[in-house]
Amino acid sequence: MMGRIFLALALVWGTWTLPAQAAEERAAQMGALFEALDLEQTVEIMHEEGLRYGAQIASDMMPDADMDSWNATIARIYDAERMSGLVRREVTARMDGAQIAPLTTFFASDLGGRIVALELAARRSFLQDGMEETAQDALGAAQRQNLPVLEQIEGLISDSDLIERNVMGALNSNLMFYRGLVDGGASDLGEADILADVWEQENAVREDTDTWLRGFLLIAYQPLSEGDIEAYAALYRSAPGRALNAALFAGFNQMYEELSYLLGRAVAEHVTSAPL
């Protein structure tokens, strides 16, 4: 009798440990992919962008704000560790069932590592004043010379639906900022009014996104050969690449929506607590 009980317990334990082991293996695979993508450096740059954006918000909406207090608030909102955690959780969930190994193999290769480094360097360079204008000048020069890289950039944009995904992400972030303002008591706009205001921004957001994205991609990928860019494009045309693209957008959009809401709440709190 005791033998049967032991056997039953062993079977139950076995059925419990298999999913746990699979989850641990999956987590390790995703950890390796995040490392190959250098996610922490990406988030660190976004953290710096957030600090700058917070300062701009203060200048535009709260010129008389206590900047020491506001800067401390912005630093708490754009906490890099929390930002990374948000992205990791969402991307990991979205990649459930997708092939991870081919992605890690590519991004851990010499070419993949170089592409990641070029993308990060380009994004960090855009933190410098005047860099966006420099990128647009470079884009104009490339267009006049009809450089082959431009056609490949168009292919990357089209294959991964980069403009539409970025536009929708930006609009959703703006929506969450409005909701933060309302929930914080700084605005009495209803949901219909908020949605109307956000949709009015669509054309401007789309134009800005198109301009920024093409300049950024040119700066990032111009050092690569046509063959290198084609190999990268082929990765994102594959099933694992499409899954990663969708998961990354979902992860970063989730992060930005939460940050935007918190930023709206923070603005509301500072505005409503300001002395008359």
Residue ranges and their predicted role:
Residues 1-7:
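Bacterial N-terminal signal peptides that target proteins for export
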Residues 13-20:
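C-terminal segment of classical bacterial N-terminal signal peptides
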Residues 22-61:
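N-terminal mature-domain "stem" immediately C-terminal to a signal peptide or N-terminal signal-anchor/transmembrane
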Residues 36-43, 71-78, 87-91, 102, ...:
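Second-shell loop/turn segments in exported
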Residues 64-73, 82, 86, 212-214:
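Acidic/histidine-rich, surface-exposed loop or edge segments in extracytoplasmic proteins
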Residues 73, 77-167:
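Acidic/His-rich structured neighborhood in mature extracellular/periplasmic domains
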Residues 123-222:
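Extended amphipathic alpha-helical interaction segments
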Residues 203-276:
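A cross-kingdom marker for long, charged
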